[in-house]
Amino acid sequence: MTMEGASGSSFGIDTILSSASSGSPGMMNGDFRPLGEARTADFRSQATPSPCSEIDTVGTAPSSPISVTMEPPEPHLVADATQHHHHLHHSQQPPPPAAAPTQSLQPLPQQQQPLPPQQPPPPPPQQLGSAASAPRTSTSSFLIKDILGDSKPLAACAPYSTSVSSPHHTPKQESNAVHESFRPKLEQEDSKTKLDKREDSQSDIKCHGTKEEGDREITSSRESPPVRAKKPRKARTAFSDHQLNQLERSFERQKYLSVQDRMDLAAALNLTDTQVKTWYQNRRTKWKRQTAVGLELLAEAGNYSALQRMFPSPYFYHPSLLGSMDSTTAAAAAAAMYSSMYRTPPAPHPQLQRPLVPRVLIHGLGPGGQPALNPLSSPIPGTPHPR
């Protein structure tokens, strides 16, 4: 079935199918506009993509190419486009490049394809605004989101509008932006978790260390004796009777021993120097305690002669002076003698050490060398008797 036009072009089915198979993008995609208008619309659709449709795809699924619907063509435009295309086909002109229109209408893969070399550079944002402000011809759709997006100002859509890009490009950028916005938070969380792990490890180390220290202290306290334990007392030396008698005789002669005398006495008694020194210290303590008790008793009784017999003084007191003293003065003298006796004198030279004969006892001796019962009551001849 073939129809002839006024200009000699045929409208046969085989002619239309052959022209469709020859690679006309306008016929294949349902675009029946003239070739010049189709190219202009293609470049316009590439240069000025629908900003609102791209905005609607932010954070949602990529928009389907079906949303870019075409208005129903008018009958006279369809006839003109068919005649023009058939005339070009009979004149054996090379077919127009099908890469650019097909690329503009078909959905691209996820990765962005390179732009054709004949495409002009994308206009600046001012030109985009002016182009978008112009009335739309064939890129408008009747979807609810597109109709609602037409009322949005272009300024809100301009930051999201870029050059020719695939529908999947904007969600990738949005996902990258979201990932970059969450990256500092993730880094902060990672740093916090690392710090928490370090603190936990340090606390575990500290607890483990304190536990080990406690175990060491327990084991050391079990194995070794306590630090504040008293030193073991030395065993008391058991002296024999012979050793005690020799030590008592030596103490009656000398209350303080020199180093040489102590060593000689220790060698004679088969004792150590430390044992002899300890025995002398204990004996002097006992002697001073007994002397203090005796001085108190004699001072209370006022018997100064007995005090002189018990504790001879190196100083000579004339009997007349002793006879004129009362009991209070005698007690004071006894206290002075006691205090002088407790002063530890330096060890005299061994050659000078000899038993001193008490001078008071010599003067207190009676006729025949017998001690007088009351030496203060027997005055020396030629001295007045005190009354």
From Swiss-Prot:
Superkingdom, natural source: Eukaryota
Compositionally biased region (Pro residues): 114-126
Keywords: DNA-binding, Homeobox, Nucleus, Transcription, Transcription regulation
Major place of residence: nucleus
Biased composition (Polar residues): 7-24, 160-178
InterPro entries: HD, HD_metazoa, Homeobox_CS, Homeodomain-like_sf, Mediator/Homeobox_domain
GO molecular function, one term: sequence-specific double-stranded DNA binding
Biased composition regions of type Low complexity, renumbered to the chain: 100-113, 127-141
Transmembrane regions: none
Locations listed in the record: Nucleus
Entry's Gene Ontology BP terms: amacrine cell differentiation; cell fate determination; neuron migration; positive regulation of translation; regulation of axon extension; regulation of transcription by RNA polymerase II
UniProt keyword annotation of Transcription present: yes
Residue ranges of the region described as Disordered: 1-145, 157-240, 367-387
DNA-binding region: 232-291
Positions with biased composition (Basic and acidic residues): 180-220
UniProt GO cellular component terms: chromatin; nucleus
Functional note: Potential regulator of neural basic helix-loop-helix genes.
The family this protein is said to belong to: Belongs to the BAR homeobox family.
UniProt protein name: BarH-like 2 homeobox protein
Protein's organism: Homo sapiens
UniProt gene name: BARHL2
